[in-house]
Amino acid sequence: MTSACTIVTVERQPTAVVRVEAVFAELPQVQRAARARLAAVLPALDAGPAGAACTRWTPPVDGKLPMEIGTIVARPFAAREGIVSSTLPAGRAVRFSMKGGFENLPLAWQTVFDWCKAENHAPAGINWEIYGATEDAELFALLAYD
């Protein structure tokens, strides 16, 4: 399921997203609904070619996970039908490659945060996943300045 965590420098990447907040029990349904909405609207946006699917999230607030569910795109665009332009951030981040199904995400994120603690790195609270063609995913946690 896992590989080692590494620190990487990432570039800002434009995204097309649906902004949502969801309780953990509803994450699969919320993800599917947001991705269906995005698929319906994305071809009409002036965002250029679509890249990999992604989800950006910040720590839960009152039991709800704030998320930007979307895809990497070539350029920013005007909002349309609830799809807004956003970015994956630039900076130093912890990178972790998860192998296997999405049910492994909680354990994978725990691995990232445990590694940060053991290595004395402070996450900034901005995290994201970039999904591959299979169920594998690349996980990133932006680092606060050490």
Map each language-model feature to its residues.
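A solvent-exposed interaction/effector surface
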Residues: 1-146
